[in-house]
Amino acid sequence: MGEKIIIFDTTLRDGEQALQASLTTKKKLKIALSLEEMGIDIIEAGFPISSPGDFKSVETISKEFKSSIICSLARCVEKDIDIAAEAMRFAKHFRIHIFLGTSPLHVKSKLKKNFSEIIDMAIFAIKKAKRYTBDIEFSCEDAGRTPINQLCYIVENVIKAGATTINIPDTVGFTIPYEFNQIIKSLYNKVPNIDKVILSVHCHNGLGMATANSITAIQAGARQIEXTMNGMGERAGNTALEEVIIAIKLKKNNLNLHTNIKHKKIYKTRKLISEICNTVIPSNKAIIGTNAFSHSSGIHQDGILKNRKNYEIITPKSIGLKPIKLNLTSRSGRAAVKYHMTEMGYDEKLYKLDILYNSFLKLADRKGQVFDYELESLAFIDQKENTTEHFRLKKFNVQHQSTGITISSIELYCGKKIKTANTRTKKGLVNSIYITLNKITNLPIYLKNIQLITQKKPINIIISIKVQIEYKKRQFYGIGNSKDIVESTAQAMIHILNNIWKANKVNILLKNIKT
């Protein structure tokens, strides 16, 4: 199993700094408990001196932790340290994390000090923190741009003063892996008392190398990695914890290292943090992006169907995800189409694969991704009916009043009939349309997700709305495009209603075949 790498999460402190608005104490507690459940060793809950809200959050979280160690940030300022300790007074065990700029740039232009004064400030702060706890971390801010001899000198002195963890941050993401590896090795070679502490690293992603720098640091001897879930953080972000955790897991035989993280909790935690912080995870984000386990190439899909290891280095299940189906696009082959039909329970005797595949390609070329319900419509409904829209928008009117009430009226073609419904709600424009359409169709549909995308055209701005609706435990997706957000939303939902109508028609047809 090898030595353990301590995982230090700073999502609630360094990660939150990237958000436009601070999180409430309730939201921070929810994230903190999810991180603890995941097995994070140390959780930096905030910077208590920075605001009353941060103080309250740290104080609240400190009462709840059962296994994770809570940590608070403090400058080399007496009051900072006092407040940090006070905020964590209810914790069974806590860490004070002191930081100070050590690079010539920070020392001269930011702190307006000389290096000797910096040493004195650091020693004073550590001795002050020792009055409250034996668990003291000292960070050499901007260590990546600090001359190695100066870095070694301050590290040696803060260890003598009582620091138990020394953190080496690449604050602006300036170093590359070889350079960062050499910094860590130099500290082990030149600092005589380095064996008395845990050496930690805190990498930023300025050059896109935060994860690589963190891994090369533990190869050089560092035993704590600091980072954030989803790589949240100021500027280009921090080391993404999920990336280093999985890298250590996959390369455990080469690294001879391990963590105590419960890997199957990763996706649940990622999703919670993304939702609470209202941050969008790039679809191609390693480990946790929506495309991380997606395969659209026909060659890749064929390989995946034969053995998922052909194109996947980890399984979705290993991070807490259900098995993910193959995306159906114009690049998909017959094998993928047949696989999807089989997964839906359709015997090949019920349809003609060659005919279905040709129809599928035409649809995929026109719209991109094809969903299962569209595939079964192609298989079992004739072309004329497939292109006929049962539901069509005749007229709509939506008004949002200053009182917060939205009034909507929709006239909808339902086959040859026209149906009308009206709604008054305080739930906003989108929900007013959803509620009104629900009244007209009387279908048990549930709005699960909505995404707005603006497209700038030479003259106009086109608003695209993507909607996800659940119907009878099945997910349906629709898209609408218009200059008007209300019309885009209505189009997207009506697109879905037509697909639901076709899905129901397929069910009726198949029941008739069986009987």
Curated annotation (Swiss-Prot):
Subcellular location: Cytoplasm
Known partners and oligomeric status: Homodimer.
Similarity-based family: Belongs to the alpha-IPM synthase/homocitrate synthase family. LeuA type 1 subfamily.
Pfam families: HCS_D2, HMGL-like, LeuA_dimer
UniProt KW keywords: Amino-acid biosynthesis, Branched-chain amino acid biosynthesis, Cytoplasm, Leucine biosynthesis, Manganese, Metal-binding, Transferase
Residue positions binding Mn(2+): 14, 202, 204, 238
Protein name as it appears in the record: 2-isopropylmalate synthase
Top EC class for this record: transferase
Renumbered residue ranges of the record's region Regulatory domain: 392-515
Needed co-factor(s): Mn(2+)
NCBIfam families reported for this sequence: leuA_bact (TIGR00973), PRK00915.1-1 (NF002084), PRK00915.1-3 (NF002086)
Function: Catalyzes the condensation of the acetyl group of acetyl-CoA with 3-methyl-2-oxobutanoate (2-ketoisovalerate) to form 3-carboxy-3-hydroxy-4-methylpentanoate (2-isopropylmalate).
GO molecular function terms listed in the Swiss-Prot or TrEMBL record: 2-isopropylmalate synthase activity; metal ion binding
Catalytic activity: 3-methyl-2-oxobutanoate + acetyl-CoA + H2O = (2S)-2-isopropylmalate + CoA + H(+)
EC number: 2.3.3.13
A GO CC annotation given for this chain: cytosol
Organism of this sequence: Buchnera aphidicola subsp. Pemphigus spyrothecae
Upper taxonomic lineage: Bacteria, Pseudomonadati, Pseudomonadota, Gammaproteobacteria, Enterobacterales
UniProt key word rRNA-binding: no
Biological process terms in GO annotation: L-leucine biosynthetic process
Main location group: cytoplasm
Pathway(s) per entry: Amino-acid biosynthesis; L-leucine biosynthesis; L-leucine from 3-methyl-2-oxobutanoate: step 1/4
PROSITE patterns: AIPM_HOMOCIT_SYNTH_1, PYR_CT
All copies of domain Pyruvate carboxyltransferase, residue ranges: 5-267
